[in-house]
């Protein structure tokens, strides 16, 4: 069994991390931590079994985060705090010798993320640090990746589209740190990073990575500042071009969709379906559609993290470097838009 602690008591920690931890047979939840005692107690009450609580306010002997990290029966932590707090928790836990599963995005910007990755890489035999990008564990996306590899061919073009609306009454918007974001991009960073990670996964399936971007952004709903919409042209390392259109500020709601067009066929992915159009050697097209029951992949990513610890072998889908590359692409989009569509390189090292 792997003793684990949950750091953070927000919505996603309560509704996703806690049940995921409790569903993985080799994980044993030992403790929870939040900055406030009240939040820590509230989270602990939701746990299936009794867990210890730790907090920093009010200061209480034996109940701080440092006290939690000093426990020898806790081998790992799941860090699910606000975007600006995450880097501090990651460093602190790794320095204490704990394996870490930290929520996406890896950090608020690439400078902070690169600093973390470089520091981690310089450590001698460090604990496992995994970044929780749960979309990489979505069953339909994994199937789309497999089909893209099977179809093969060279990339011709690609498309990512999502249109939706984050309303003022949305439970995630109601959190103070999202109402007044002190990080770039607002919901485009907080939620859009999932879409970017999914696009990169499918581009990698045809041997491509984004290289350059040109983007424009807008703010359609004032409460979603600084920006809620981005439209971009993205070029890959082999000079293939595609588009990225993401908005959290439009009433019209469309499903998330990624289309990969190669010289051998087309893959269209949504979270609940994968459509394959395969061009045969004779020139005929064969269509196939496979449907899925939606699963956000959170349980699967905790299972992968647990196995990584037990086998002492990090899962590449949770690599901090992959998370850094996700962030680098998104930051390049935002940076280009801030410069009225000027071309930006996707820098991640």
UniProtKB/Swiss-Prot annotation:
Q: What induces it?
A: Expression is induced in the presence of 6mM glutamine.
Purpose: Dehydrogenase; part of the gene cluster that mediates the biosynthesis of the gamma-pyrones fusapyrone (FPY) and deoxyfusapyrone (dFPY). FPY is an undecaketide and thus likely synthesized by the polyketide synthase FPY1 from acetyl-CoA functioning as starter unit and the addition of 10 malonyl-CoA extender units by successive Claisen-condensations.
The pathway this protein participates in, as annotated, is:
Secondary metabolite biosynthesis
Which gene specifies this protein's sequence? FPY6
- Superkingdom, according to UniProt? Eukaryota
List the protein's name: Dehydrogenase FPY6
Q: Which InterPro entries match?
A: Gfo/Idh/MocA-like_OxRdtase_C, Gfo/Idh/MocA-like_OxRdtase_N, NAD(P)-bd_dom_sf
KW Translocase (keyword) present: no
Q: Which GO terms describe its biological process?
A: NADPH regeneration
Q: Which keywords has UniProt assigned to this entry?
A: NAD, NADP, Oxidoreductase
Q: What is the originating organism of this protein?
A: Fusarium mangiferae (Mango malformation disease fungus)
Q: Look up the EC number in the record and give it.
A: 1.1.1.-
User: A Gene Ontology MF term for this entry?
Assistant: nucleotide binding
Q: Which GO terms describe its cellular component?
A: cytoplasm
Q: Which family does it belong to?
A: Belongs to the Gfo/Idh/MocA family.
PANTHER family the record matches:
NAD(P)-BINDING ROSSMANN-FOLD SUPERFAMILY PROTEIN (PTHR42840:SF5), NAD(P)-BINDING ROSSMANN-FOLD SUPERFAMILY PROTEIN-RELATED (PTHR42840)
């Amino acid at each position: 069994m792997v003793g684990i602690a949950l750091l953070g008591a927000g919505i996603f920690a309560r509704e996703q991390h806690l049940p995921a931890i409790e569903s993985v047979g080799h994980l044993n939840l030992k403790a929870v931590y939040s900055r406030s005692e009240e939040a820590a107690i509230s989270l602990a009450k939701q746990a299936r079994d009794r867990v210890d609580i730790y907090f920093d306010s009010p200061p209480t002997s034996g109940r701080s985060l440092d006290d939690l990290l000093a426990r020898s029966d806790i081998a790992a932590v799941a860090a699910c705090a606000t975007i600006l707090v995450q880097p501090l928790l990651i460093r602190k836990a790794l320095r204490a010798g704990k394996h870490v599963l930290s929520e996406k995005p890896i950090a608020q910007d690439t400078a902070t993320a690169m600093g973390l990755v470089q520091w981690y890489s310089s450590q001698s035999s460090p604990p496992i640090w995994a970044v929780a990008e749960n979309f990489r564990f979505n069953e339909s996306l994994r199937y789309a990746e497999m089909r893209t590899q099977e179809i093969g061919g060279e990339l011709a073009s690609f498309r990512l589209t999502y249109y939706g609306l984050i309303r003022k009454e949305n439970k995630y918007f109601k959190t103070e740190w999202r109402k007044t974001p002190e990080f770039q991009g607002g919901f485009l960073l907080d939620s859009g990073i999932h879409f970017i990670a999914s696009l990169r996964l499918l581009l990698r399936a045809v041997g491509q990575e984004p290289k350059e971007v040109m983007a424009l952004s807008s703010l359609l709903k004032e409460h979603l500042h600084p920006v809620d919409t981005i439209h971009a042209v993205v070029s890959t390392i082999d000079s293939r071009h595609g588009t990225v259109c993401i908005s959290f500020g439009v009433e019209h709601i469309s499903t998330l969709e990624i289309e990969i067009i190669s010289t051998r066929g087309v893959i269209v992915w949504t979270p609940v379906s994968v459509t394959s159009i395969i061009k045969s050697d004779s020139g005929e097209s064969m269509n196939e559609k496979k449907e899925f029951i939606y699963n956000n992949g959170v349980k699967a990513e905790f299972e992968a993290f647990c196995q990584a610890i037990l086998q002492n072998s990090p899962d590449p889908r949770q690599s901090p470097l992959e998370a850094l590359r996700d962030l680098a692409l998104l930051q390049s989009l935002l940076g280009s838009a801030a410069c009225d569509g000027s071309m930006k390189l996707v820098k991640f090292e």
